[in-house]
């Protein structure tokens, strides 16, 4: 009976040590997985705006599928740990109850099965970790390429923004020049209207001056005709006056000489 108890205690200690080692390995694997995921997260972290740094749909889908697998593995490990805790609790109860030592073989069989399940789960977990690492190793170059293209697109976008600002400045300058040209055109239109108005007034005055000139020409012609008639009349008067003077001088000469002698008869 004492040997059975010693064997049970030794088996219990061995199971506890194996569980401790398994837990340490699980923690180490979990930490390694966290490091891999942290590295992936640092690479997958968006550089600019979230909508501008979205990963391709296939990469995100693969990453989410691997995350679900990891969660399932963690749940399975928790179930195994729970089973081990339950088993250890039952072993504690067995130590306190001597009647339960008869089930030592059954306990060993369960412990062996638990070890096998743990090994299988660990192997499956490591396989999935390797799959995740491979998927990440395949995804990282694509992510880097996406980041490179994003950087190129960002530079191109900045260049386009710079060109846009230059074009906007040119557009504003052109609009200001257009406004100035419109003001100048309005001023020229006003000046042209004023020049046309003054020209029209000058033409009207010129037409009036032409009419006055024609009237003056007609009046001058009439005055010229009057002058010619007056000159003709004066000439006629002068000629008549000269004739009268000559006649009077002849009469005076006759009076001075006396009566004229009668002509001699033959």
Swiss-Prot record:
It is found in: Nucleus; Chromosome, Centromere, Kinetochore. GO terms for cellular component: cytoplasm; cytosol; dendrite; kinetochore; Knl1/Spc105 complex; nuclear body; outer kinetochore. Residues 136-237 form a coiled coil. Keywords: Cell cycle, Cell division, Centromere, Chromosome, Coiled coil, Kinetochore, Mitosis, Nucleus, Phosphoprotein. Signal peptide: none annotated. GO terms for biological process: cell division; establishment of localization in cell; homologous chromosome orientation in meiotic metaphase I; mitotic sister chromatid segregation; mitotic spindle assembly checkpoint signaling; regulation of meiosis I spindle assembly checkpoint. Expressed abundantly in brain and at lower levels in testis and kidney. Residues 105-115 have a biased composition (Basic and acidic residues). Residues 95-115 are annotated as: Disordered. InterPro entries: Zwint-1. The modification Phosphoserine is found at residues 232, 265. It comes from the Eukaryota. Its main location: nucleus. Gene3D superfamilies: 1.20.5.4090. Acts as a component of the outer kinetochore KNL1 complex that serves as a docking point for spindle assembly checkpoint components and mediates microtubule-kinetochore interactions. Kinetochores, consisting of a centromere-associated inner segment and a microtubule-contacting outer segment, play a crucial role in chromosome segregation by mediating the physical connection between centromeric DNA and spindle microtubules. Component of the KNL1 complex composed of KNL1 and ZWINT. Part of the ten-subunit outer kinetochore KMN network that includes the KNL1, MIS12 and NDC80 complexes; a bioriented kinetochore contains approximately 150 copies of the network. Interacts with the MIS12 complex subunits MIS12 DSN1, and PMF1. Interacts with the NDC80 complex subunit NDC80 during mitosis. Interacts with ZW10. Interacts with CETN3. This is Outer kinetochore KNL1 complex subunit ZWINT.
